[in-house]
A protein has these predicted regions:
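Formylglycine-dependent sulfatase
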Residues: 2-3, 19-167
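Cleavable N-terminal signal peptides
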Residues: 7-8, 18
């Protein structure tokens, strides 16, 4: 009798492990303009106090060896989000990589296509000030990448003076 229970018990645990859904990890990605790792206390800054970021870093994965593909945010972000170098995305200014990468997935789109809820707050694909973003609209975003988009209402500003883009050189 005990042998039958032991076999039944073993089969039950085998079945649970075989048919259990694979564990999905929670993924939180934070990106910020002009924020270097040296500005966060989890990377050793003793002046700035960032306890919430520190707590996330202590419980998750903290990257310590990353490289920037562009010298300013448009090409760098497009490269990071798509996995392609700026010259391959054609993003050398502030525009979306989508026209150049076509139907190839961004990493956020890959998460979305695999059952994750992907959300972003404010702009990710820096395309100047996307139309409607100041009123809380979606702007000119990459809709295929997000389940939910939220833009805080508020104006962006530009520093006074003239600028020169590499595109016009």
């Amino acid at each position: 009798m005990h042998k039958n229970w032991l076999i039944l018990f073993s089969l039950f645990f085998f079945a649970v492990n075989v048919f259990a859904a694979p564990k999905k990890y929670n993924v939180l990605f934070i990106i910020s303009d002009d924020l270097t790792s040296t500005a966060l206390s989890c990377y050793g800054n003793t002046v700035c106090k960032t306890p919430n970021i520190d707590a996330l870093a202590a419980r998750g994965t903290r990257f310590t060896r990353t490289y920037c593909q562009g010298t300013y945010c448009g090409p760098s972000r497009a490269s990071f989000m798509s996995g392609y170098y700026p010259h391959a995305t054609g993003v050398l200014g502030y525009k979306s990589p989508r026209p150049k990468i076509g139907n190839r997935s961004t990493w956020s789109q890959h998460f979305k296509n695999n059952g994750y809820h992907t959300a972003r707050v404010s702009k990710i694909y820096h395309m100047g000030v996307p139309g409607g973003i100041e009123q809380g609209g979606h702007g000119a975003d990459d809709a295929a990448s997000w389940t939910e988009r939220f833009n805080s209402q508020g104006p962006e500003w530009k520093a006074p003076g003239n600028t020169l883009s590499l595109i016009h050189i």
